[in-house]
């Protein structure tokens, strides 16, 4: 029996593990183990089938949840003859059709009662690694002091934490690296919080956080250089024209033009250069109740189907 595996960046990063077993009927049952704490979009493409009946669902293109996901089965034409199949795979963080609430009210990610001057960062005109482009690039900069606390603006599950770099603590605003926390929301959008002081994260991947919960400390040097909160919310958007992968990635990030709650102003989009005061009113903090849906959690066992 000959079985071959094609090119796959899944194995190098170990975020998604694809495996298959042969069942009692001789079928090859494929599954994917998602080690992340949010949904991923998985695509599997087969280039070779020898003595294998192609499954009508192929190429496989679907969301996989955290934990174990059963995918599909391949059946040999003649169980007594060798089989061969070659496939490639790719994945993207997020949902195929993200049900994002672009009118959601976010807290300012700073201490209640604290005042800050807000700026919109300019678009760097380049996409993040693995993306074809970014739409509506929108990142807020909040002037802070070193050691100030960063708070979660919305309920969600921590998906990534990076706080190992010390460049920003030496006063570098754009050091090429950025300490940050990423949090997944119930509508499959993601919040990015930076720039954290080295080793200052107060949360870890997989942790459920509530609105207004401390998640890290602001970096920067003793003179305040590099001391700012960079806050953005984005979600996955698929490009059907590029979905085959023949001309590049078929996914890109769309940024949400945030509606934030501030004291004396209420809900609204923040103006570049204006000064605002943070406030955590209960109505905003509790707008996502338990009954309205839970953020995605990683399962310890069982299967997602």
Predicted segments with their positions:
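Surface-exposed, glycine-biased beta-strand/turn segments
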Residues: 61-177, 275-305
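Short histidine-centered loop motifs in beta-beta connectors
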Residues: 189-212
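Flexible, gly/ser-rich surface segments that form the specificity/activation loops bordering the active-site cleft
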Residues: 160-176, 213-230
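Short beta-strand elements of extracellular/lumenal beta-sandwich folds
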Residues: 17-37
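Short acidic, flexible loop segments centered on an aromatic residue
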Residues: 24, 35-54
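A structural signal for short beta-strand/turn segments enriched in small hydrophobics and glycine
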Residues: 150, 156-158, 206-218
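Bacterial Sec-dependent N-terminal signal peptides
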Residues: 1-16, 32
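Acidic, glycine-rich catalytic/binding loops that coordinate metals and/or anionic ligands
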Residues: 106, 202, 207-210, 230-305
């Amino acid at each position: 029996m000959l079985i071959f595996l094609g090119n796959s960046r899944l194995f190098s990063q170990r975020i998604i593990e694809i495996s298959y077993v042969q069942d009692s009927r001789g079928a090859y049952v494929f599954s994917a183990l998602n080690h992340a704490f949010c949904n991923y979009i998985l695509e599997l493409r087969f280039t070779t089938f020898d003595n294998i009946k192609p499954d009508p669902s192929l190429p496989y293109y679907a969301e996989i949840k955290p934990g174990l996901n059963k995918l599909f089965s391949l059946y040999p034409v003649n169980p007594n003859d060798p089989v061969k199949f070659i496939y490639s795979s790719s994945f993207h963080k997020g949902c195929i059709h993200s049900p994002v609430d672009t009118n959601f009210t976010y807290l300012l990610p700073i201490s209640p009662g604290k005042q800050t001057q807000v700026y919109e960062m300019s678009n760097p005109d380049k996409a993040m690694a693995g993306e074809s482009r970014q739409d509506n690039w929108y990142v807020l900069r909040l002037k802070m002091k070193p050691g100030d606390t960063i708070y979660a603006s919305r309920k969600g599950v921590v998906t990534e934490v990076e706080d190992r770099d010390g460049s920003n603590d030496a006063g570098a605003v754009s050091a090429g690296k950025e300490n940050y926390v990423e949090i997944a929301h119930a509508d499959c959008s993601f919040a990015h919080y930076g720039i954290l002081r080295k080793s200052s994260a107060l949360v870890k991947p997989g942790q459920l956080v509530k609105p207004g919960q401390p998640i890290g400390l602001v970096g920067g040097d003793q003179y305040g250089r590099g001391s700012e909160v960079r806050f953005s919310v984005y979600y996955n958007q698929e490009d059907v024209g590029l979905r085959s992968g023949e001309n590049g990635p078929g996914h890109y990030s769309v940024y949400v033009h945030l509606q934030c709650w501030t004291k004396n102003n209420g809900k609204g989009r923040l103006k570049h250069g204006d000064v605002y005061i943070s406030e955590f009113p209960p109505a905003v903090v509790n707008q996502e109740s338990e009954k309205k849906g839970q953020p995605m959690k990683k399962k310890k066992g069982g299967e997602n189907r």
